[in-house]
Amino acid sequence: MNIYLGCPIWSFKGWVGNFYPKGTKPADFLREYVRRLTTLEGNTTFYAVPAPKTVESWVENTPETFRFCPKIPKAISHNGKLLDYVERALEFINVMRPLGPRLGPMFLQLPPRYSPSLLGDLEAFLFRMPRDIRLAVEVRHLDWFESPHD
């Protein structure tokens, strides 16, 4: 069994001098991060899809054993029914594929308004996702934690 430990970000200037060595430049944050941690939630992808060149630099600056766990962009997860955004989700997955073995589970964080009444939409969306992609779903509407959904 492999255990991975990480944070949702690596680019935090407040870590310079304690978590990162004193004088570490932002361009070197990822290289320093992977010296201590083995995974990253990848919260930046929630706000914007990275350019392919950015993904390439992530590969170049991390060992093959490192795992990126990108968050599905909010433009997909927070804009209504997921099924309407299947193509955009597949495009996002393809942007992440160059991570190769570094690609860990992806996170689909649902907004608090996404209730169990949309379970059919969620199931249809997940059914259309590639089977080789691991996808974790975070529900936030309180009704998900009530019977019969708990």
Show the residue positions of the predicted features:
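Residues lining hydrophobic/aromatic ligand-binding pockets adjacent to catalytic sites
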Residues: 1-150
